[in-house]
Curated annotation (Swiss-Prot):
It comes from the Bacteria. It is found in: Cytoplasm. GO terms for biological process: 2-deoxyribose 1-phosphate catabolic process; carbohydrate catabolic process; deoxyribonucleotide catabolic process. InterPro entries: Aldolase_TIM (IPR013785), DeoC (IPR011343), DeoC/FbaB/LacD_aldolase (IPR002915), DeoC_typeI (IPR028581). Belongs to the DeoC/FbaB aldolase family. DeoC type 1 subfamily. GO terms for molecular function: deoxyribose-phosphate aldolase activity. Its EC number is 4.1.2.4. GO terms for cellular component: cytoplasm. It comes from Staphylococcus epidermidis (strain ATCC 12228 / FDA PCI 1200). This is Deoxyribose-phosphate aldolase. The active site is at 89 (proton donor/acceptor), 151 (schiff-base intermediate with acetaldehyde), 180 (proton donor/acceptor). The keyword Lyase applies.
Length: 220
């Protein structure tokens, strides 16, 4: 297994510059990461720069709060795909989940899945803000809505992926969906812990450091 292909090389800071985007694109080409994950404003450029490579372009929808309307998330998804996005990481309506308005949460996800038109959709449930029951419910709603992945975190809510959350999410979705761990995965040890817990994709800005750690530890 090429572990670089488990990494979405990520740059989602609001002050990301073109120079920084160029850096992660070049790193993704060099290390053969699964994707670069960038804000929608950078999707078209990233897509142009990665044309003819195996590196996918991933973007975020309703990010980071999940509090835009379903119609906006749907339009944002279509626009991103028109600009070259191949994977979509969307944030759920967290408040609706906490209110118990589960139909709204599911409909919100379904709208993005439909707008994505067959592209991979990863659903960010923002674990740090949820109870255990809410985490389980969010995973169940994501599955019912036809998503492909559940994802732990935006990295903008004061906490990221934990081994416990990844295990819980994987136990909930089984082999029917995949789990993406993101937020705070900074080194090889974090990476290995998340994969062992059941994640099959890692979102990280530290992709290069992770792979360099992998390369330096190839003896065992």
């Amino acid at each position: 297994m090429n572990k670089a292909k488990l990494i979405d090389h990520t740059l989602l800071k609001p002050d990301s510059t073109k120079e920084q985007i160029d850096t992660i694109i070049n790193e993704a080409k060099a290390y053969q990461f699964k994707s670069v994950c960038v804000n929608p404003t950078h999707v078209q450029y990233a897509s142009e720069q990665l044309k003819g490579t195996d590196v996918l372009v991933c973007t975020v929808i309703g990010f980071p709060l999940g509090a835009t309307t379903t119609a906006v998330k749907s339009y944002e998804t279509k626009d991103a795909i028109n600009n070259g996005a191949q994977e979509i990481d969307m944030v759920i309506n967290i408040g609706a989940l906490k209110d118990g308005r589960f139909d709204e949460v599911q409909n919100d996800i379904e709208a993005v899945v439909q707008a994505a038109n067959g592209k991979t959709v990863k659903v960010i449930i923002e674990t740090v803000l949820l109870t255990e029951k809410e985490k389980i419910k969010a995973c169940q709603l994501s599955e019912a809505a036809g998503a492909h992945f559940v994802k732990t975190s935006t990295g903008f809510a004061g906490g990221g992926a934990t081994v416990e959350d990844v295990k819980l999410m994987k136990d909930t979705v089984g082999d029917r969906l995949e789990v993406k761990a993101s937020g705070g995965v900074r080194n090889l040890e974090d990476f290995n812990n998340m994969i062992e817990a059941g994640a099959t994709r890692i979102g990280a800005s530290a992709g290069v450091q992770i792979i360099q750690g992998l390369e330096s530890n190839t003896d065992y």
